Design a protein with these regions (language model features):
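Nucleotide-activated chemistry modules centered on ATP-dependent adenylation/adenylyltransferase
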Residues: 1-447
Length: 447
């Protein structure tokens, strides 16, 4: 985003951009210390560690100052100067803070009444740093106008409860040592758990669409009062997984060695939004913190020790691209390390064409597609997104994604060769990991 803004600024003839921050010293002791250490200023831009300009106009404001400023704009006729946000936006903001404080927020908008600042704090709905419970969110969902967020709170609680369930973790290490080994140890979330989380979020999205449609019907039928709040609730209030995000998720999941078929994430979307399957978030007891066991090191060579892996190379696309995409300068591409892979294009960051993603996910991917992809290897959809340029890779990072694809394909083919299920493959990795590593170069095997 910053790179794009800088390009636009240069095109306009501007010297550089300055980021306006909403940080306040009074937010917390740690925030204040960090702001002072960075020498943030409210009156002049300062340079951060990356030599970028920023300014913090609210640096010395208190929470009372914030709400006093908002109350000044709560009356359309008495605003001191024009502003971009409406009175309704201020009212909704006040309602949110009141709901997050068990309905006892003392902010009164307008010219009359006691104005006591509300100190409730908000952030990411899935934040687990706040503790075992998100009390502000729990307070909000007790009120009818915010009850739609109950499922989001369930998802957050599920994340927190299962973070130490190591059976939900990946065993295959992400780094390849110079000796040709990967670590076998619980690490990031496993493929099956990532799919579970995706299905839960897709279900929440589908349920929110249904809620909004029913609310709209109830309002039209006169079953609920015609109020600004109820009119707002006729709209979908959130979408956790957009088509663009789904494509990016699918790209990553399809390179996983346990992906059972191509387009795993898009197939999950189809099951929820077209087949109307619902995946409810289970309530689980919190798993206690346990030691993370290193099972040892598993030999893979250059991901060629016991099975072949070509990663993102697509022989079929190389043959067909001259016919399907005759305007391209080549039918394939090369990574930064010179490896031949499927055709791809690059941008400042991993990016997805939002319009084409939406078209493919919501229109092209039908029952025929859903059935056909069950017979295709997972890696094929990663190649598809690249070859069709629906997804572009970060400039200069192509080799990194090739290595990810090769690792996933290697273990997928090893499991196929040994005829092992994912659970059996995990046990095979543990049983065949090198426990005694004295004969290996420990320095080269550092994680």
């Amino acid at each position: 985003m910053r790179a794009a803004l800088e390009r636009d600024a240069t095109a306009r003839g501007d010297r550089e951009i300055c980021t306006v921050l909403g940080n306040r010293i009074a937010e917390s002791a740690s925030r204040g210390v960090a702001m002072l250490a960075r020498a943030e200023s409210a009156i002049a831009p300062t340079r951060d560690a990356n030599d970028a300009l920023s300014i913090s106009p609210l640096r010395d404001w208190s929470v009372d100052d914030i709400w006093l400023m908002l109350t000044m704009f709560a009356d359309e006729e008495k605003r001191p100067f024009p502003c971009a946000f409406s009175v309704r936006s201020i009212e909704r903001l006040s309602d949110l803070y009141r709901a997050g404080n068990d309905g006892m927020c003392g902010v009164v908008l307008g010219e009359s009444g006691q104005r006591t600042a509300c100190g409730s704090r908000f952030g990411c709905v899935f934040c687990c740093v706040v503790g075992d419970r998100d009390k502000s969110l729990e307070s909000m969902i007790r009120e009818p106008e915010h009850a739609y967020m109950a499922g989001l709170n369930d998802f957050r609680n599920y994340l927190l409860a299962t973070q130490w369930d190591l059976k939900r973790r990946e065993l295959v290490g992400r780094s390849l040592s110079s000796a040709g080994y990967v670590r076998v140890q619980p690490d990031v979330l496993s493929f099956s758990e990532r799919m579970n989380l995706l299905r839960y979020l897709l279900t929440l999205d589908a349920l929110e669409i249904e809620r909004a449609e029913q609310h709209d019907a109830d309002l039209a039928a006169g079953l609920i009062p015609d109020t600004p709040e109820n009119r707002d609730l006729c709209d979908v209030q959130f979408e956790m997984i957009t088509p663009s995000q789904l494509v990016a998720i699918d790209f990553m999941l399809s390179m996983h060695h346990y992906a059972p078929h191509a387009f795993p994430a898009v197939s999950a979307w189809f099951e929820v939004h077209r087949l109307r399957r619902r995946y409810r978030i289970p309530k689980v007891d919190t798993f206690p913190k346990v030691p993370i066991v290193n099972h040892g090191w598993f030999r893979v060579g250059q991901f060629d020790a016991d099975a072949p892996a070509e990663g993102l190379r697509d022989f079929g696309a190389e043959q067909w691209n001259r016919y399907r995409h005759p305007g391209r300068v080549s039918t394939y591409a090369q990574t930064t390390a010179g490896e031949r892979v499927v055709y791809f294009e690059q941008s400042d960051h991993l990016d997805v064409d939002a319009e084409r993603a939406c078209e493919f996910v919501t229109c092209s991917f039908d029952y025929e597609w859903y059935a056909r992809v069950q017979a295709n290897a997972g890696i094929e959809s990663a190649r598809f997104w690249l070859n069709e340029t629906i997804l572009t890779l970060p400039t200069g990072k192509s080799q990194r994604y090739q290595e990810m694809a090769a690792r996933g394909q290697y273990f997928a083919r090893l499991a196929e060769r040994l005829n092992l299920t994912p659970a059996e493959m995990d046990q095979y990795l543990i049983s065949n990991a090198v426990k005694e590593v004295q004969q290996l170069d420990l320095f080269s095997m550092a994680a």
